[in-house]
Amino acid sequence: MSSSKVKAHKVHLLIEEIPTIEQMKKSFLDLYDGWKCPSCGLEDETFDHVWTCDEHRSLLLKIKNNTIDLLLSLLIEYNPDITDYSALLMLNIWTISTDPDNFTFVDLIKGFIPLELTQILNLWIQLLLVIIEIRQYIYEQTFKEIWIRRCSFIKEFERSLGITKKKKLTLKNFRPFNNILNSDRELEYKFDALDSIRNNIYFGKNIIEFYSNLTS
Ligand SMILES: [Zn+2]
């Protein structure tokens, strides 16, 4: 991936604006109305839900544990004299949830490096080298293991419904009975496209069934 794309993705993470289903509804409500999280099929797929979805829990736990292992190995490498890591391990940043009052692992995914973490590390080592490495590890792991996987899932699902980039552009800002549509044929085409997608979602292929077929 190009460095400009990596930067764009990091900025979008920071401002919680990756293209989740809830985010897509803002531009394509007609298309995504009623859609739920592609992984569990139960909750609305908000930014926070991508990382706290039950279906991603074991993966995220693995990433979190590997992050702690990596951090400890870096600390041992840079300062073999440290013997007690309990203050570090007790930080709230290792919790996999969202919390309005405390920084959690979800905030690390966004790219935040909380002061409480840097304060502890500062006592022990040359901070910057470790922070850069840890930050990059979390970014690469959550991006590859959770976000990219989720995106290929959605892509496959959309393809099965005939939703292409071109079709999305056609449907963007579309509202029935507005004045933009001036030919009957155009109107008919747009209703057809929407109806067939809706039928697929609501009556044809059940989303959950589709997902289980895809994974089995
Ligand atoms: Zn979910």
Tell me the role of every PLM-derived stretch.
Residues 1-216:
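Family-specific functional microsites
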